[in-house]
Regions:
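Start-of-helix register in tetratricopeptide repeats
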Residues: 286, 319-320, 400, 434-437
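Bacterial N-terminal signal peptides that target proteins for export
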Residues: 1-5
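Canonical tetratricopeptide repeat
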Residues: 323, 404, 438-441
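Peri-catalytic and regulatory segments of divalent metal-dependent proteins
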Residues: 23-171, 191-194, 209-246, 250, ...
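TPR/TPR-like (Sel1-like) alpha-helical repeat modules
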Residues: 347, 415-433, 443
């Protein structure tokens, strides 16, 4: 499973699959992974199936599935193009959906539900990379990996305290909601998806995923590109999930590159990949903006800056400028990038302990008490202000830029300027969902000090 993002972290628009301008000899035999035809369902398997069916319903009920028809249709088109034609599997109904989670992750449930988080899709460069993620997850379902892993480990899991096993991983917001749902309904899934399956099963999913990509005429070297993207540690998280375990990711890069051989850079011309990247970004732009807000809401401020900058680089004179301003405003006194020292295992452990004990506001106060924090805060406020002003200078400026300036000025003590920006926002967006809250902020700021 391509891991790294979502609450439970499970192990990677309408464009046609990239077709080669001319057929090239595949670096490996382009055959889909064989179905585990010897697999027979037993009671323990049917019990697990019942649990994961309930998980699907809970994800929908609790608002964790992204309600965007175009995005989910896009995922379904890619997924269905990878599934071998005519394939039928007992107790499998293919579903491909996006999950509202800013952590990069993807996972497959054994009933055929494939989930990719908004956090992962926001990091990818093109459709072929998304196909690589889905192909990996499809293999887990087709080879019945979840059932086999459950059969081999369920007795051990029965003696485990699942929450203590993931104790250091205690996210809030959307991410915490997913963890809660999964641990309540199917605790085994948490272990499998956070830590991945056995090395042999994950390797099989990687290599057979490449074969599936070739069969669907996706450039298979993009499987390696996905691993390289995920190998970038933006948040410095201490818990090693399947998709952010960097030593393991490097090992996967090595054996995938070896599997592909020396043809990795020759299968698809770079210009064709660049065109595909542009098409992918056009399709994913709304989703990536949504993911920036999720990242801000869950305290993943560096990820918000990273994704917003990707959007601005792709489409500079657009609403994306506002989102980059929001990301810098909320980044506050934090450094935009972690140092090598902060990315060491010991530093990550210390940071995880601190996150458990303090709120974002407390972290802000701590950092603002240091010269570095004060310097970062000043630089990021200035950067955010410039970006908000730039957003307001666009042909169709978003009123939310006035709200952002109001929040920025209020925090820095510029009360009169904050009121003016809030009033402008209220005037331009009278039907905004936060209109009443903004009016109350205006009233509060206008009151004379006691």
């Amino acid at each position: 499973m391509l891991a790294g993002a979502l609450c439970f972290c499970i192990a990677f628009t309408s464009l046609a699959p990239v077709a080669f301008s001319q057929k090239k000899k595949a670096p490996v035999e382009a055959t889909p992974p064989p179905v585990n035809e010897e697999f027979k369902f037993g009671k323990v398997d049917l019990d697990l199936l019942e649990q994961v069916d309930l998980l699907d319903r809970r994800f929908e009920r609790d608002g964790l599935v992204l309600e965007d028809e175009a995005t989910n249709a896009y995922l379904a088109r890619i997924g269905n193009s990878l599934v071998p034609k005519g394939l039928t599997l007992e107790h499998v109904k293919w579903k491909f959906r996006a999950l509202r989670d800013p952590q990069p992750n993807a996972f497959a449930l054994p009933n055929g539900s494939i989930y990719v988080t908004t956090g992962l899709m926001s990091l990818l460069d093109n459709e072929s990379q998304l196909a690589a993620v889905i192909a990996h997850e499809l293999t887990h379902v087709m080879r019945r990996h979840t059932y086999m892993f459950n059969r081999s480990n369920r007795k051990k899991f029965l003696t485990m305290n699942i929450m203590s096993a993931i104790g250091a991983y205690a996210p809030g917001g959307i991410v915490g909601a997913v963890i809660t749902v999964v641990t309540t309904i199917a605790p085994f899934i948490v272990i499998a998806t956070i830590f991945g399956y056995s090395r042999d099963l994950e390797r099989e999913a990687d290599l057979k995923g490449i074969d599936m990509m070739i069969s669907a005429e996706y450039p298979p070297e993009e499987m390696v590109s996905v691993m390289k993207l995920l190998n970038k540690d933006i948040e410095g998280e201490e818990v090693r999930l399947f998709y952010n375990d960097h030593p393991a990711l490097q090992e996967r890069i090595n054996y995938l590159s070896s599997y592909l051989g020396a043809r990795a850079d020759k299968v698809t011309p770079q210009m064709e990949l660049n065109r595909e990247k542009a098409a992918y970004f056009r399709k994913m732009e709304p989703l990536m903006r949504h993911d920036i807000q999720l990242a801000i809401n869950t305290g993943r401020f560096r990820s918000a800056v990273y994704v917003a900058q990707r959007l601005v680089d792709f489409h500079p004179d657009s609403e994306n400028v506002f989102w980059l301003a929001e990301a810098y405003r909320t980044l506050g006194p934090r450094a935009a990038q972690l140092t090598e020292k902060e990315l060491t295992n010991s530093a990550k452990k210390d940071a995880a302990k601190k996150r458990e004990k303090r709120t974002v506001e407390e972290e802000d106060r701590e950092l603002l008490a240091t010269p570095a924090g004060q310097e970062n805060s000043k630089a990021h406020q200035q950067k955010a202000e410039e970006l908000y002003q730039q957003a307001l200078g666009l042909e169709n400026p978003a009123p939310t830029a006035h709200r952002g300036l109001g929040m920025l000025y209020e925090k820095s003590g510029r009360t009169a300027d904050a009121v003016a920006e809030y009033e402008k926002y209220a005037e331009l967006a009278p039907n905004a969902i936060d209109h009443d809250r903004i009016q109350k902020r205006i009233e509060t700021l206008r009151r004379p000090p006691p």
